[in-house]
Amino acid sequence: METVQLRNPPRRQLKKLDEDSLTKQPEEVFDVLEKLGEGSYGSVYKAIHKETGQIVAIKQVPVESDLQEIIKEISIMQQCDSPHVVKYYGSYFKNTDLWIVMEYCGAGSVSDIIRLRNKTLTEDEIATILQSTLKGLEYLHFMRKIHRDIKAGNILLNTEGHAKLADFGVAGQLTDTMAKRNTVIGTPFWMAPEVIQEIGYNCVADIWSLGITAIEMAEGKPPYADIHPMRAIFMIPTNPPPTFRKPELWSDNFTDFVKQCLVKSPEQRATATQLLQHPFVRSAKGVSILRDLINEAMDVKLKRQESQQREVDQDDEENSEEDEMDSGTMVRAVGDEMGTVRVASTMTDGANTMIEHDDTLPSQLGTMVINAEDEEEEGTMKRRDETMQPAKPSFLEYFEQKEKENQINSFGKSVPGPLKNSSDWKIPQDGDYEFLKSWTVEDLQKRLLALDPMMEQEIEEIRQKYQSKRQPILDAIEAKKRRQQNF
């Protein structure tokens, strides 16, 4: 028995990469197995740590991404040590990519599981996931950190069913001198009203997002998911808190839990610690109840992978009729002895198991970062005169200013009348819309349809404006990065 133990000593668990590992090239330390999906700022891969045999997740981030946000994500993960938060092991620079090595959660995100099974979650399943998520939020908030992007796509499950918070690409740190933040950041449908209004917010902004996430897990998508994100941004602060579409389907405890999360006044909203004592959470069952849905989702994923592999093999067979093949993986170039290697991908976006930004919605929402220039330094805040009326968010002010400029440029050049081209519509300067009564329904519908393209164009102009500011900074960072071997 002793001989067996000596021959097969148990491998130690990876806790953090040591200095020796960090001075090597990442390929010497890890074997990358497959692509898992897309996270904030980069792609996520499944890999194995050669020394311990432990499976890890590696986020590969191009250096042209927002390096400041990436470094912030690393910094926050480094400071966290909780079973309810994804662990960080270390980072590397490799060619034009930053490799961030993190804990691997084999079951993927909650939104992945919903999508793979094409089925929403039961109350028992939701309660168990919320309990772990609240413990993660309680830990983060105790550390004075705000996640700022809580949603089903950022809650990962390991194969045992333990939920962990992930994707800290937009997380923020609160300091003693900065009780509230004033930047609009997060994913639109999950945003708290005070975040959208830019009136300052603290940790309980995550609680609002958690309430929206609870509805998302129950109904498959968050409230307002069927409308344009920019319209949702107008509606969230002005409308009453959202509720279930069919309240009669859900228990009083679950309904009350969501109600406690979705209180519009942040001062009256419950904290993570308080919600852990809520009857809905206290009655949560163990993680074993999640194993069936995890196994079902992983079976669906495996079948999709096998189907995709068959398609790849079939394509290879069809191509072999035209090219000389060697073992199905080597395509010999005509007239060239050495040939050309063809790498066959066995994964597509449909088989992801980590974080995908389409979540459970039909459109790719991603993470919206508005007014991002205030994030360049953690301590920067916008202060408002509290004696003034609540100011409009900066992105709304931009749209209004842009429209005024268009009105001035077009004043006197057009007369309100039937629509000829939906793209040339100008809002009347005097705000008089009486002339609309004389238009046909068809003209009105055309003008309504013209609003979204106009808005998208203005958003793109904003993006280009900030990109022109960011690029010189990114160029300087890349120049410095070239002088480093490892991060």
Curated annotation (Swiss-Prot):
MF (Gene Ontology): ATP binding; identical protein binding; magnesium ion binding; protein homodimerization activity; protein kinase activity; protein serine kinase activity; protein serine/threonine kinase activator activity; protein serine/threonine kinase activity
Catalytic site: D149 (proton acceptor)
GO biological process, one term: hippo signaling
Annotated positions of the Phosphotyrosine modification: Y433
Binding positions (ATP): L36, G37, E38, G39, S40, Y41, G42, S43, V44, K59
Induction per the UniProt record: Activity increases during mitosis.
Segments forming a coiled coil: 290-310
Broad EC category: transferase
Phosphothreonine: residues carrying this PTM: T3, T183, T340, T367, T387
Residue ranges, annotated region (Disordered): 303-332
Domain Protein kinase: 30-281
The enzyme's E.C. designation: 2.7.11.1
Highest taxon in the source lineage: Eukaryota
The reaction(s) this protein catalyses: L-seryl-[protein] + ATP = O-phospho-L-seryl-[protein] + ADP + H(+); L-threonyl-[protein] + ATP = O-phospho-L-threonyl-[protein] + ADP + H(+)
GO CC terms, sorted: cytoplasm; cytosol; nuclear body; nucleoplasm; nucleus; protein-containing complex
Disease: Immunodeficiency 110 with lymphoproliferation: An autosomal recessive, primary T-cell immunodeficiency syndrome characterized by progressive loss of naive T-cells, recurrent bacterial, viral, and fungal infections, warts, and abscesses, autoimmune manifestations, and cardiac malformations, including atrial septal defect. Patients are at risk for developing lymphoproliferative disorders or lymphoma.
Biological role stated in the UniProt entry: Stress-activated, pro-apoptotic kinase which, following caspase-cleavage, enters the nucleus and induces chromatin condensation followed by internucleosomal DNA fragmentation. Key component of the Hippo signaling pathway which plays a pivotal role in organ size control and tumor suppression by restricting proliferation and promoting apoptosis.
Family: Belongs to the protein kinase superfamily. STE Ser/Thr protein kinase family. STE20 subfamily.
Name of the protein: Serine/threonine-protein kinase 4
Protein source organism: Homo sapiens (Human)
Gene: STK4
